[in-house]
């Protein structure tokens, strides 16, 4: 284990929208260090969203999608006297954002559209409209926390 907590490294805002969340999203989307490919996919998805419905901005849809997918509660396993309990805990803001990004990318990759740009654009649109697999994942996480509310007193 490390002696000290690692300092949080600051991410630079992306060059087009000046948004740090987009930079984090691109970094999570990246495979094998190919950031230019991930950047093309991300900006392509935002353009595709704007093309589908001209009256909304792609960046607003992206922000709505992130907000709708952020989990408030999650369950953590806690072992007490030989039994393992699923204890509901609140999610820290940084983890909320990280989970939202991870779920959006994971479920976008699992979609059946042809290109990753289309997959990501449609997943972001669904999430912004409170639909889609990533939103369902958030709902399932919340239901698990609600179901195990009785074990909330085992918090750390």
Swiss-Prot record:
Keyword rRNA-binding (UniProt): yes
Any one GO molecular-function label of the UniProt entry: rRNA binding
GO biological process, one term: translation
InterPro entries listed in its UniProt record: Ribosomal_uS7, Ribosomal_uS7_bac/org-type, Ribosomal_uS7_CS, Ribosomal_uS7_dom, Ribosomal_uS7_dom_sf
Transmembrane segments: none
CDD domains documented for this protein: uS7_Bacteria
CC annotations in GO: small ribosomal subunit
Tagged with keyword Kinase: no
Keywords from the named record: Ribonucleoprotein, Ribosomal protein, RNA-binding, rRNA-binding, tRNA-binding
Listed SUPFAM superfamilies: Ribosomal protein S7
Self-association state and partner proteins as the record states: Part of the 30S ribosomal subunit. Contacts proteins S9 and S11.
Primary role: One of the primary rRNA binding proteins, it binds directly to 16S rRNA where it nucleates assembly of the head domain of the 30S subunit. Is located at the subunit interface close to the decoding center, probably blocks exit of the E-site tRNA.
Membership in a protein family: Belongs to the universal ribosomal protein uS7 family.
Name of this protein: Small ribosomal subunit protein uS7
Upper lineage: Bacteria, Pseudomonadati, Campylobacterota, Epsilonproteobacteria, Campylobacterales
